[in-house]
Amino acid sequence: MAPKKESLYKVAAENRRARYNYEIGETFEAGLMLTGTEVKALRTGKATIAESYASVERSGELFLINATIPEYLQANRFNHEPKRPRKLLLHASEIVKLAQGTEREGMTIVPLKIYFNDRGRAKIEIALARGKQLHDKRETEKKRDWDREKGRLMREKG
């Protein structure tokens, strides 16, 4: 049997609050259309996608909005704009599915993480999600705390 390869992708940015603030539905993997300095800046791991979202334009294209990829320090006059809208690359059928999902009440497209795959390409994991209300967030917190407590009790009793 061949030795099992471990995960080869490197996470550049992660939206950890998304799973707390939203009920995550279907997830998609999309490519990112980036400039050279954006790729180099992403590799430093200082990008922020916590306040970002994706939207489908009338032309049938999907854009990542409000994501911050800081300027690359070694690039001088050829640097990029940190908060520009970035095009996401998906199949047309997937874009149609996302557009139909956002037309439903309360659904939005949320980025979960940006990573580099095993071929060195920048990819983004996006999800169709519905925003949680305050009581749902409290319920999630209670369940997580109870699961932790159960784990502690099971370890103590052995």
Swiss-Prot record:
Belongs to the SmpB family. Keywords: Cytoplasm, RNA-binding. GO terms for cellular component: cytosol. One of its GO terms (biological process) is trans-translation. GO terms for molecular function: RNA binding. Residues 133-158 are annotated as: Disordered. The keyword Cytoplasm applies. Required for rescue of stalled ribosomes mediated by trans-translation. Binds to transfer-messenger RNA (tmRNA), required for stable association of tmRNA with ribosomes. tmRNA and SmpB together mimic tRNA shape, replacing the anticodon stem-loop with SmpB. tmRNA is encoded by the ssrA gene; the 2 termini fold to resemble tRNA(Ala) and it encodes a 'tag peptide', a short internal open reading frame. During trans-translation Ala-aminoacylated tmRNA acts like a tRNA, entering the A-site of stalled ribosomes, displacing the stalled mRNA. PROSITE patterns: SSRP. This is SsrA-binding protein. InterPro entries: SmpB, SsrA-bd_prot, SsrA-bd_prot_CS. It is found in: Cytoplasm. HAMAP family: SmpB.
